[in-house]
Amino acid sequence: MNKILKPINILCFVCLSLLSKQAHAADTAVLRIGFLLPIYNDSNSSQSQKAIGQAALDYYSGVKIALSRLQTLGLHVRVFTWDLNLKNDSTLIDITKSKAFQTLDVLVGPIDQKSTNTIASHLQYTDFLWISPLKQLNLPNTVNSLNFFADDMYRIRGLIGDLRIKYPNHDWCLVTPKEQNERVAVWINELQKAGISYKKVIYSNNKISPKPPRKEEVLLINAGTNNFSKLSQYKAIARKYDSYIVGDLEWYQNVMSIDEVDEKRIIYPQINMIYGLDSLTESFTKEFVDSSLAEPSKFAFIGYDQLNYIGLNFLALGHDFYHHFPKGEHTGLINNIQITKATDNQWVNTGMRLNQLEFIEVREIENEENSEQDKN
């Protein structure tokens, strides 16, 4: 099961800030936010275009639920939406010159580098926060920017910070394939920067060498290995009561259960994760289904989490909120958000979730039920 409990997020901070502030003037209390997303598709659209469009639509639907809920907390918002699939380069340039664009507090999108470059090369107004919501993009350094999905360096840096807090007494082993890769180099560099000592372990031919330390508290941290390698790693720590395997950043894309492995000892780092329904995700899912007549994808949850975070910060801190992002980690429905400054006016999200899963064998449960019926 997911071992992470949802802590009190920045909502408490927002409430305290709102109580301590005088009412803003009407023209300064409005969050003006624009969305540039590829939503529209028709019969001539390719399958990949349709998939991207559906993801963007789900994201935007999650955004609308977040904004609706934030309005009950007192948020005043003006929303401007431009559909990228109905625009060409010349109309994108026209958008940057429009009155609506010139007064934005936040711009969300596009989600491709080509459109981003077109807009960036024609910017006249730069006093806003430009957000890349679904992938790492090169945003211009002439504006304040936030990438919600960071590259390996920042993801690994965030993961190191989380592991350091949660497992302060454990010995660290970096498990790598025999053939070194770029991710291994990033791990080594970030571990050195953090001043963390570690033992290097090689995974090859379904074996790891050398063996982990004798200590009971050991972390086997994977860099560039495959999901199946956890079997040989688990054998090395099975008798250590407080040792864990930390999967590679890609493991959660293809989680598989291996009979000989106790999944409660495997940690899957992930930026976002849907695992079951607690009361908060269940409430969101119901509201999404009622409004969209479909189950929410992960993109709907991402849209909700991101805009909930932005809106709460705007409520608490005003128009220049992005210069004062809180240092604490915000736990959303499926995303942990930890904003880290990359440069003077560029930020990235380094929040990670440490997921531990528990697989339930349904067939065994059914057999037990049948046995009870036979007895009766």
Over which residues does each language-model region extend?
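Extracytosolic ligand-binding ectodomains
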Residues: 2-5, 23-376
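Sec-dependent N-terminal signal peptides
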Residues: 4-16
